[in-house]
């Protein structure tokens, strides 16, 4: 039998006492009362903050949204299938935040900034709050630089500036995503970082967009944030804020960014689902009372920074889906009132083969010509008015049998102007090509052509300018003005090509 001496026992006890650590940690905990439909009711958590992250026993994270007198309503960031009634929940003391870094460029991530493209982890040393306050008046300056979309109809008549918020609105299947993705493709070489946020879309649609970006080399300056239709409502609600936090990171580093929210109708629906399950009182169209604030606090984060802050910018292009062209519904009117203009896409124009199907009459940019280079202002200044007059005249001409020559000429000119605004998808045009195209139409050079020949001729003209008149591009790029020299070059090229084209068509 082993005998222990008294001094050995006292040594062991002394060591144990020295090793004993009296670290007292206060943890704010609660108990699950009920769970289901992506919502949990928690008893306890007396000191939890609104919007604080809470952690369940089995690892699921949630956000405390409803702070009531006898329980806390938590929305889950996962399916929560393993959460049991009576299990414990602890407050983390943190508000939702994500890691941010340059390494996110070219990646596809979810609303929690975790990669979902199967290309490994993303290293990041900094983090940003998902929800941060919008820049104040002093830290902004007015929008003055253009953000070229590559679409003639937009860049000439509804110009978008860096730091602007321009809504893209229309029915389903009218080409809203196509306008947004073409804008991203056109930023190649423009030193603009793009963030594309897909909310509640089919995974196949998102994959198609990502494939287009990869094929056209756009992923190197783009981040895709995707929460598809099968994601929990909480993550669909958070995705736009995650995208905004990433875009803000680059904006504060004196870079230009552009962010597309595709689309905010789905985010509002996800928020409505969460709010109704949390028993918040419903308002118009069953949306909660703060659905306006949901979108305003997101879109107000887009800004053009002042010179003191480095002149970075964040341009927001939110997309909203309408039902049968009803622009006066709740979410469309909300977002229209928040943004600095809207691009309205019409199903009738789309079905008539006018693509992009932009209704120039009710589309508007509240920044206007401040977001255009001088050359574009000089050439396209009257285009919108001419097209609006043409649309009015066309409607009237349907009922009139005999029209005078001047009216017939105006109708013919209008039809050709409308024709030159048509563009194929994923085929953005450089600004000098747009200027050449509009000048050709506005000055009547297309009048001798049949409407069906316009597109073919314009392709031929742009190819000729690129190959043989490169100085035209150089003048526009360097001076940003449509000088007399540039006009003379363009006029000569157009006249020469028209004659050549008509000869080719006759033979």
UniProtKB/Swiss-Prot annotation:
Pfam families: ATP-synt_ab (PF00006), ATP-synt_ab_C (PF00306), ATP-synt_ab_N (PF02874). Its EC number is 7.1.2.2. Keywords: ATP synthesis, ATP-binding, CF(1), Chloroplast, Hydrogen ion transport, Ion transport, Membrane, Nucleotide-binding, Plastid, Thylakoid, Translocase, Transport. InterPro entries: ATP_synth_asu-like_sf (IPR023366), ATP_synth_asu_C (IPR000793), ATP_synth_asu_C_sf (IPR038376), ATP_synth_F1_a_nt-bd_dom (IPR033732), ATP_synth_F1_asu (IPR005294), ATPase_a/bsu_AS (IPR020003), ATPase_F1/V1/A1_a/bsu_N (IPR004100), ATPase_F1/V1/A1_a/bsu_N_sf (IPR036121). Its main location: plastid. The record marks 363 as: Required for activity. CDD domains: ATP-synt_F1_alpha_C, ATP-synt_F1_alpha_N, F1-ATPase_alpha_CD. It catalyses: ATP + H2O + 4 H(+)(in) = ADP + phosphate + 5 H(+)(out). It comes from the Eukaryota. Produces ATP from ADP in the presence of a proton gradient across the membrane. The alpha chain is a regulatory subunit. Belongs to the ATPase alpha/beta chains family. This is ATP synthase subunit alpha, chloroplastic. It comes from Dioscorea elephantipes (Elephant's foot yam).
């Amino acid at each position: 039998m082993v005998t222990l001496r008294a001094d050995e026992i006292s040594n062991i006890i002394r060591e144990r006492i020295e090793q004993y650590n009296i670290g007292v940690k206060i943890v704010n905990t609660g108990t699950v009362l009920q769970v289901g439909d992506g919502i949990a009711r928690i008893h306890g958590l007396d000191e939890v903050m609104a919007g604080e992250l809470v952690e369940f026993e089995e690892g699921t994270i949630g956000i405390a949204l409803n702070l009531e007198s006898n329980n806390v309503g938590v929305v889950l960031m996962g399916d929560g299938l393993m959460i049991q009634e009576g299990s414990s929940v602890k407050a983390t003391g943190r508000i939702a935040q994500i890691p941010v870094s340059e390494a996110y460029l070219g990646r596809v991530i979810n609303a929690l900034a975790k990669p979902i493209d199967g290309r490994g982890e993303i290293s990041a040393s900094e983090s940003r709050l998902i929800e941060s306050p919008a820049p104040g008046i002093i830290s902004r300056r007015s929008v003055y630089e253009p953000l070229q979309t590559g679409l003639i109809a937009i860049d000439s008549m509804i110009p978008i500036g860096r730091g602007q918020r321009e809504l893209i609105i229309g029915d389903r299947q009218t080409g809203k995503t196509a306008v947004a993705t073409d804008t991203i493709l056109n930023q190649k070489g423009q030193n603009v970082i793009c963030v594309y946020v897909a909310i509640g879309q089919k995974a196949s649609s998102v994959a198609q967009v990502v494939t287009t970006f990869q094929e056209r080399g756009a992923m190197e300056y783009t981040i895709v944030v995707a929460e598809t239709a099968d994601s929990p409502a909480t993550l669909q609600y958070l995705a736009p804020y995650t995208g905004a936090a990433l875009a803000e990171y680059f904006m504060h580093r004196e870079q230009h960014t552009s962010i597309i929210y595709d689309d905010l109708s789905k985010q509002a629906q996800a928020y409505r689902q969460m709010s109704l399950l949390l028993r918040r009182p419903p308002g118009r169209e069953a949306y909660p009372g703060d659905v306006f604030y949901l979108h305003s606090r997101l879109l107000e984060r887009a800004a053009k920074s002042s010179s003191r802050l480095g002149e970075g910018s964040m341009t927001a292009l939110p997309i909203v889906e309408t039902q049968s062209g009803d622009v006066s519904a709740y979410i469309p009117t909300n977002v229209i009132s928040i943004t600095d203009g809207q691009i309205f896409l019409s199903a009738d124009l789309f079905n008539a083969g006018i693509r992009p199907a932009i209704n120039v009459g009710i589309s508007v940019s509240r920044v206007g010509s401040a977001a255009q280079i001088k050359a574009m202002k000089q050439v396209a200044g009257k285009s919108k008015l001419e097209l609006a007059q043409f649309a009015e005249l066309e409607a009237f001409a349907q009922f009139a049998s005999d029209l005078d020559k001047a009216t017939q000429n105006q109708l013919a000119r209008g039809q050709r102007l409308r024709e030159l605004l048509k563009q194929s998808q994923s085929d953005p045009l450089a600004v000098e090509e747009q200027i050449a195209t509009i000048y050709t139409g506005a000055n009547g050079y297309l009048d001798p052509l049949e409407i069906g020949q316009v597109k073919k001729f314009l392709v031929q003209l742009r190819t000729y300018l690129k190959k043989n008149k490169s100085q035209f591009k150089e003048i526009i790029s360097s001076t940003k003005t449509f000088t007399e020299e540039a006009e003379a070059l363009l006029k000569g090229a157009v006249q020469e090509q028209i004659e050549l084209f008509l000869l080719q068509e006759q033979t």
